[in-house]
């Protein structure tokens, strides 16, 4: 299990605006294919705890965002 920023389909951080507890990020992190245990908004990106090892996290190699 790992912690990290979720990435969107472009490979950049999944954005959020309401910092701290954030229902959107929490829901996104807990999707079955993502496997996170908790999510919140930190630095305007959705940060997840307890992700499965197969879930990509930001920054991705060779991405400039």
UniProtKB/Swiss-Prot annotation:
Expressed by the venom gland. InterPro entries: LCN-type_CS_alpha_beta_dom (IPR044062), Scorpion_toxin-like (IPR003614), Scorpion_toxin-like_sf (IPR036574), Scorpion_toxinL (IPR018218), Scorpion_toxinL/defensin (IPR002061). It holds the Pfam family Toxin_3. Residues 2-65 form the LCN-type CS-alpha/beta domain. It is found in: Secreted. Disulfide bonds join 12-65, 16-41, 25-46, 29-48. Keywords: Disulfide bond, Ion channel impairing toxin, Neurotoxin, Secreted, Toxin, Voltage-gated sodium channel impairing toxin. GO terms for cellular component: extracellular region. One of its GO terms (biological process) is defense response. GO terms for molecular function: sodium channel inhibitor activity; toxin activity. It comes from the Eukaryota. Belongs to the long (4 C-C) scorpion toxin superfamily. Sodium channel inhibitor family. Beta subfamily. Has the structural arrangement of an alpha-helix connected to antiparallel beta-sheets by disulfide bonds (CS-alpha/beta). Beta toxins bind voltage-independently at site-4 of sodium channels (Nav) and shift the voltage of activation toward more negative potentials thereby affecting sodium channel activation and promoting spontaneous and repetitive firing. Not toxic to mice, chicks, crickets or woodlice (at 5 ug). This is Toxin Co52. It comes from Centruroides ornatus.
């Amino acid at each position: 299990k790992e912690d990290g920023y979720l990435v969107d389909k472009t490979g950049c951080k999944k954005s959020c605006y309401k910092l701290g507890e954030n229902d959107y990020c929490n829901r996104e992190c807990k999707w079955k294919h993502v496997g996170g245990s908790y999510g919140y908004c930190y630095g305007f990106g959705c940060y997840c705890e307890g992700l499965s090892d197969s879930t990509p996290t930001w920054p991705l190699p060779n991405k400039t965002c």
